[in-house]
Design a protein with these regions (language model features):
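A short, structured active-site edge motif that brings together acidic residues
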Residues: 17-30, 51-60, 88, 112
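CE4/NodB-like, metal-dependent polysaccharide N-deacetylase domain
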Residues: 36-57, 74-78, 130
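Beta/alpha (TIM)-barrel catalytic core signal, keyed to glycine-rich beta->alpha loops juxtaposed to Asp/Glu
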Residues: 59-221
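Short, acidic/polar
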Residues: 32-47, 92-95, 116-117
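Structured loop/turn residues at beta-strand edges in well-structured enzyme cores
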Residues: 15-18, 47-50, 79, 103, ...
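Helix-loop "lid/cap" segments that line or gate small-molecule binding pockets
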Residues: 9, 43, 188-190
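Glycine-rich loop at the start of a catalytic domain that most often binds anionic cofactors/ligands
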Residues: 5-14
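Short, small-residue-biased leader/transition segments that mark boundaries at the very start
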Residues: 1-3
Length: 221
């Protein structure tokens, strides 16, 4: 779904706008202060909305991220974005950002799953009240056959995907599993009628083996 389709869906929905959370991103080729402001204006125009709920810097481009963040602060102060945040920022990038501003990101969107827990970044964000949002929370389905995950899923009468999502929620993470299949989308949302026990959570925590599907943010200086 493209940005125009997303905006049209929001505008035509019978759900009140205040109950729909709209997030969009500043892409790498639009970073920098002036470029970021112009990019946001384009995104808002394409969405056909008066504001977005969350605007994120997609990647910590080394020479431009500070200026990009200043632009996001301006966008928020103008009331065009309710919250601002980052994506793929390591704890090192965040520490550098903190030295230039008093306004902390509300969110850091990073790759997270039981098989990639990114402990240093996760601990840093929690200690600074930055909400973690995990993308690829299902590891693109490539670890569904893991024996520990499969056993816990069978014990809960749930799918491995549902267990992975529930694990993330119990860790305090937001999750954005990707699917275009209506049945799977429904299953991914059906995770609020069970809990994973402390023992099962510990077994899932032990699955962390740095199984990464996307570029490592620590590779960016």
């Amino acid at each position: 779904m493209c940005i125009r389709d997303s905006g049209e869906a929001v505008r035509e929905s019978t759900v009140p706008r205040a109950e729909i959370f709209v997030t969009t991103k500043l892409w790498d080729n639009d970073q920098g202060y002036d470029a970021a402001l112009k990019a946001f204006d384009r995104s808002l125009e394409e969405l056909g909305l008066d504001y977005v709920d969350l605007y994120l810097i997609h990647w910590p481009v080394q020479t431009l991220r500070t200026d990009s963040w200043r632009a996001l602060e301006r966008i928020k102060s103008d009331g065009m974005a309710r919250s601002i945040g980052v994506s793929n920022f390591s704890h090192i990038h965040l520490q550098a950002l903190f030295s230039t501003t008093d306004q902390r990101p509300a969110v850091n969107q990073i790759e997270l799953s039981p098989f990639l827990q990114q402990t240093p970044i996760s601990k840093f964000c929690r200690s600074h009240n930055i909400q973690l949002t995990g993308y690829c929370p299902l590891a693109k389905g490539q670890r569904f056959d893991d024996p520990t995950l499969s056993k816990i899923a069978a014990q809960k009468n749930k799918s491995p995907a549902q267990v992975m999502i529930r694990w993330a929620l119990q860790k305090g993470q937001a999750v954005i599993p990707k699917s275009s299949n209506p049945r799977r989308i429904g299953q991914n949302a059906d995770v609020f009628d069970f809990e994973i026990s402390p023992d099962q959570m510990a077994r899932l925590d032990a699955l962390d083996d740095d199984y990464r599907l996307c570029p490592d943010p620590l590779s960016m200086p």
